[in-house]
Amino acid sequence: MKNIHQTAVIEDGAIIGDDANIEAYAFVSKDAVLGNNVTIKQGARVLGKTRIGDNSRVFSYAIVGDIPQDISYKDEVDTGVIIGEHATIREFCTINSGTHKGDGITRIGDNAFIMAYSHIAHDCIIGSNVILANNATLAGHVELGDYAVVGGLTPIHQFVRVGESCMVAGASALSQDVVPFCLAEGNRAYIRSLNLVGIRRRFDKEQVEELVRAYKFLFNQGISLKDQANELIAKTSDENVKKMCKFILETTRGIPLAKGRD
């Protein structure tokens, strides 16, 4: 059974799933689609062609699906936001719709935890089980892999890719790509180590040891990172190690390393 407060505004055409809870003064636009058991809390706004998956919550005064903060945006149609199931979008977050410079959609996977005042710009692609701490700021076209964590007060430059199970520490500033399973920190942030806390939560001891060996081979040799990745990908059978190597070989923004490395 839907529970919609009498002061909430639901435009004609909006699709609201079963057991939705829409609180006072919330707004849901005509093109929005809310899954089952979705909660839109007091004063939150769901705009444009936004789709929110089952069992998700949008907290007070968050704004999901408004137009992008992009000076080249021209009132494009068929753009929007897609959010997976079990997402938590906390107070005052802003998530902008996509543009035709991407595929038109800003995407967020399942089990996202987006803390208060965070910003996700147009055309970002966010994996599943991602955490953004308070005031994390993603510029346009940023990509975060599954299980990535971005600390509070950290901005990420447009088009940057952060790999699977990465950690970007709080109060950092990131302008280059972070290899899967690694931890980056600083202003400007560079890769400091493996994200051991994160990978130990996901993988068994043998898998962690494979990643430790790969990290030492790639980053502690004082040799070209891409040369090391080419050599390692040719001889490893470990899928996680292959992900690291492939990411390095595909980067367009470069990998942030300590000074003196290339």
Swiss-Prot record:
Origin superkingdom: Bacteria
One Pfam annotation reads: Hexapep
Q: Which GO terms describe its biological process?
A: lipid A biosynthetic process
- Pathway as given in its UniProt record: Glycolipid biosynthesis; lipid IV(A) biosynthesis; lipid IV(A) from (3R)-3-hydroxytetradecanoyl-[acyl-carrier-protein] and UDP-N-acetyl-alpha-D-glucosamine: step 1/6
Q: Where are the transmembrane segments?
A: none
- Keyword flag Membrane: no
A GO molecular function assigned to this protein is: acyl-[acyl-carrier-protein]-UDP-N-acetylglucosamine O-acyltransferase activity
Query: Coiled coil: which residue ranges?
Result: none
InterPro entries in UniProt: Acetyltransf_C, Acetyltransf_C_sf, Hexapep, Hexapep_transf_CS, Lipid_A_LpxA, Trimer_LpxA-like_sf
Keyword annotations from UniProtKB, A to Z: Acyltransferase, Cytoplasm, Lipid A biosynthesis, Lipid biosynthesis, Lipid metabolism, Repeat, Transferase
Question: Does Endoplasmic reticulum show up as a keyword for this record?
Answer: no
Gene3D superfamilies referenced in this protein's UniProt entry, alphabetically:
Hexapeptide repeat proteins, Udp N-acetylglucosamine O-acyltransferase, C-terminal domain
Query: Where would you find this protein in the cell?
Result: Cytoplasm
As recorded in UniProt, its EC number(s) are 2.3.1.129
Gene Ontology annotations for the cellular component aspect, listed alphabetically: cytoplasm; membrane
Cross-referenced SUPFAM superfamilies: Trimeric LpxA-like enzymes
Q: Which reaction does it catalyse?
A: a (3R)-hydroxyacyl-[ACP] + UDP-N-acetyl-alpha-D-glucosamine = a UDP-3-O-[(3R)-3-hydroxyacyl]-N-acetyl-alpha-D-glucosamine + holo-[ACP]
The record describes the protein's role as: Involved in the biosynthesis of lipid A, a phosphorylated glycolipid that anchors the lipopolysaccharide to the outer membrane of the cell.
Family indicated by similarity: Belongs to the transferase hexapeptide repeat family. LpxA subfamily.
The annotated subunit structure for this chain is: Homotrimer.
* Matching PANTHER family: ACYL-[ACYL-CARRIER-PROTEIN]--UDP-N-ACETYLGLUCOSAMINE O-ACYLTRANSFERASE (PTHR43480), ACYL-[ACYL-CARRIER-PROTEIN]--UDP-N-ACETYLGLUCOSAMINE O-ACYLTRANSFERASE, MITOCHONDRIAL-RELATED (PTHR43480:SF1)
> Could you tell me what this protein is called?
Acyl-[acyl-carrier-protein]--UDP-N-acetylglucosamine O-acyltransferase
Gene behind this chain? lpxA
